[in-house]
Amino acid sequence: MASSPLPGPNDILLASPSSAFQPDALSQPRPGHANLKPNQVGQVILYGIPIVSLVIDGQERLCLAQISNTLLKNFSYNEIHNRRVALGITCVQCTPVQLEILRRAGAMPISSRRCGMITKREAERLCKSFLGENRPPKLPDNFAFDVSHECAWGCRGSFIPARYNSSRAKCIKCSYCNMYFSPNKFIFHSHRTPDAKYTQPDAANFNSWRRHLKLTDKSPQDELVFAWEDVKAMFNGGSRKRALPQPSAHPACHPLSSVKAAAVAAAAAVAGGGGLLGPHLLGAPPPPPPPPPLAELAGAPHAHHKRPRFDDDDDSLQEAAVVAAASLSAAAASLSVAAATGGAGPGAGGPGGGCVAGVGVGASAGAGAAAGTKGPRSYPVIPVPSKGSFGGVLQKFPGCGGLFPHPYTFPAAAAAFGLCHKKEDAGTAAEALGGAGAGSAGAAPKAGLSGLFWPAGRKDAFYPPFCMFWPPRTPGGLPVPTYLQPPPQPPSALGCALGDSPALLRQAFLDLAEPGGAGGSAEAAPPPGQPPPVVANGPGSGPPATGGTGARDTLFESPPGGSGGDCSAGSTPPAEQGVTSGTGSASSGAGSVGTRVPAPHHPHLLEGRKAGGGSYHHSSAFRPVGGKDDAESLAKLHGASAGTPHSAPAHHHHHHHHPHHHHHHPPQPPSPLLLLQPQPDEPGSERHHPAPPPPPPPPPLAPQPHHRGLLSPEGTSCSYPSEDSSEDEEDEEEEQEVDVEGHKPLEGEEEEDGRDPEDEEEEDEETRVLLGDSLVGGGRFLQGRGLSEKGSGRDRTTPAVGAFPLALNSSRLLQEDGKLGDSGGSDLPAPPPPPLAPQKASSSGGSRPGSPVHHPSLEEEPSYKDNQKPKENNQVIISTKDDNFSDKNKGHGFFITDSDSSGDFWRERSGEHTQETNSPHSLKKDVENMGKEELQKVLFEQIDLRRRLEQEFQVLKGNTSFPVFNNFQDQMKRELAYREEMVQQLQIIPYAASLIRKEKLGAHLSKS
């Protein structure tokens, strides 16, 4: 390394340009190097970066993973691996004990399962090959290595480096016959001398000469050994720099970065990445292409090309994120602004601070351009696996950006989702997106994005985990599953800016997952144009999704048509509803409603729905509650700003809704959150939202009988959708269901009563939260979720099964959104509450949107049955439903209070039509079915989920509207998610099948 003319060892890799890595700096002698004890931890300064070392087998070895994540973070794993192989560096796997030592030393993340250790010399060579000039070793003109091999009878010769100018160069002179051979041929050349003993060639092949050819001198000088290592590394794929202009292009990176100031990619490349990568050749050629970023802003496809795959380090990622934001922003101006803001922050922070400003500008100014850039490549480009290959953003090479177009057509997708960012790139992108301009080292920005979008680190990012926010809807209006990356999505002029993308993505996924995909699709499709702006307004967590929800809800409402609409859609509508619910919270929240809903009546998601579908369904109306996840995000984002007004109207509508929930109540489009909010309203209202009135738990009980009738709307509310996200609730409700069947008439009150205390209590919080939040359901749901989890021990326990199924549904719809995106039930729970809120959500669902949201699915099946009854006898059945709740609440009051009511409400609402049949059935099997119903619910839930999954899968499979799915990663993610859910269902069904199959399955099938 000493030979390499790099800056001092103290230079920080990121801080300085290419010179940052100095050969000399590679390894600074460590004091106490002589007395090495096994597993002794040390530190080696490599190119100015401290690398943890461990004494293994008497040799000090460095953590390759740490080197890859720090010094070589700009290079893809494949690049590093190939180079390591090319250099003949063998990795020694550390033992579990050593791995733990490395973890505690901070070299490895706690989640790491293995770590390769390489010697200090090997680490220096590896880093030098990437960071140093790739120039052949300086050797005397007439120098030759005395080499020999032991293949066959063996042979000895002189390897003349001066002649080694290609992989096939005849540079080895046989010392026996004086003929010249190429290294590959020489190992097959041997003379059978009398004293030669035959040695099996040991898999000697045309490319194994580096293994078989050894220096004849058994103890050569270090300089000789190092020179030999360097020579062997020549013409070995790994060390071959890309055919880009040489590292000198580094300066180009800067201009590039300047150009990309708007484009973003060069920032990192220029500052930290440029220098580092420039030497890698990738930096040099790319700079010219990066300038196109400006063009990209203008809409130049090339620029688009460039920006997406900027390899720059953090800035690159940040800028990419900005770009992504800009692209999305093209869809949503507000988003573009946000992108600009976020991008600028990180960019400034990062090495490409200068670029950042440009980036910010590019984000806002180039929003349209970004959109245009999306256009250039609407098909996913799947570059050779390389850290950078996944996207310039991912690749930290300034130059690499040019080499590989971003796999995701829109830069934003990569940046926003940190999908393919290499190790830390994701973090950078996230930071950029978040606008966390902590790019001082660029590492900070990276970390930000990674954490923002998902916990995965850069390496994980390389194979990105499922999107944590739901993929925004595609241009076609088709929702993108949560686990699908939506590279083309940006192309869709959706307002899927990074800011809103989480919600939007969630919504998209929800729509996709919705069984009522047609409705969801149609609904989603129209709003995309409208939602983008609204979505843009979304901070990126809840609001955008909310907007999506509104549209989605409307869609759902419209497709279902009458009061039976939600239910009529069958399991499909419920899924849609559940989906809508998930997004609904957001829509009920800040103006997302307007976005998503055909009518951009931000405050009144329900209203928007009303407009969307003249006789929208209550479930639709409550879907916003269902969208608790979004609501929660919104609540967090917006505090309790808009929630109160919303909740008030919702409450009223809710109360009106409740009575007619099973009937379409187009005029009652207040968001479910609203419905939840008005717990203190009239007793009837309370009945609608008994839980919502925490202050008057008794009143809710009193109204409960009355509310039971209202509860029936719960069935109308599209219990199915709730089923999606309300698996937990379903489980808990399953118990309720049994009770419901046992004493529906009386228990409704009791159930309300039993559940009310907790529900009310939680509801109080949630109500407050919801009220506080424009999406009343949002914050409250969040709380409810927590409450549900705490309070609904049973609910959550069943969730073990129920929640799991819920996860299945959700994973397709809300769960992925909620569980992944929201990490809590807030997302998940959101869907059930919407329908729930109208009837019981206010009392239980509303009170405990979180729990209900998430339990509707669990309770949904029972709801399903009950709902059938409620369909015919809405009020009576509702009463029964209430009883159900009451019973369950009594049984599991601690959690059922919220969850149960939530789930039941959903069920009644959505399943009301279907519940009629089961009312008597339920009553008969009150006790007997308690367990069975739970299982049945789970099974039905699974069945419904399967339907939705199939639907979603079909959509994903053959829909041109989802160009995103052309992406290999998307496909893999899709398949993985599908398989995962299949497995989960398989786990659940056997347990539920035995009990459910007999009666419940038949009943369920007859219902559905």
Swiss-Prot record:
It comes from Mus musculus. Acts as a TGF-beta antagonist in the nervous system. Exhibits transcriptional repressor activity. One of its GO terms (molecular function) is sequence-specific double-stranded DNA binding. Residues 649-666 have a biased composition (Basic residues). GO terms for cellular component: cytoplasm; nucleus. InterPro entries: c-SKI_SMAD4-bd_dom, DNA-bd_dom_put_sf, SAND-like_dom_sf, SKI/SNO/DAC, Ski_DNA-bd_sf, Tscrpt_reg_SKI_SnoN. It is found in: Nucleus; Cytoplasm. SUPFAM superfamilies: Putative DNA-binding domain (SSF46955), SAND domain-like (SSF63763). Residues 280-315, 514-927 are annotated as: Disordered. PANTHER family: SKI FAMILY TRANSCRIPTIONAL COREPRESSOR 2 (PTHR10005:SF7), SKI ONCOGENE-RELATED (PTHR10005). Residues 724-739, 748-766 have a biased composition (Acidic residues). Residues 626-635, 787-797, 856-872, 880-890, 905-915 have a biased composition (Basic and acidic residues). Belongs to the SKI family. This is SKI family transcriptional corepressor 2. The keyword Transcription regulation applies. GO terms for biological process: cell development; cerebellar Purkinje cell differentiation; cerebellum morphogenesis; negative regulation of BMP signaling pathway; negative regulation of transcription by RNA polymerase II; positive regulation of smoothened signaling pathway; regulation of cerebellar granule cell precursor proliferation; regulation of dendrite morphogenesis. The lineage of its organism: Eukaryota, Metazoa, Chordata, Craniata, Vertebrata. Residues 284-294, 525-534, 691-703 have a biased composition (Pro residues). It comes from the Eukaryota.
